[in-house]
UniProtKB/Swiss-Prot annotation:
Coiled coil: none annotated. It comes from Taxus baccata. The lineage of its organism: Eukaryota, Viridiplantae, Streptophyta, Embryophyta, Tracheophyta. GO terms for cellular component: extracellular region. This is Endochitinase 2. The keyword Secreted applies. GO terms for molecular function: endochitinase activity.
Amino acid sequence: TAGFGVFTNIINGGLECGK
């Protein structure tokens, strides 16, 4: 997701945000 992607980017190393 876009909103959660920012935080997920830091946690998962950019899996969601890098999608």
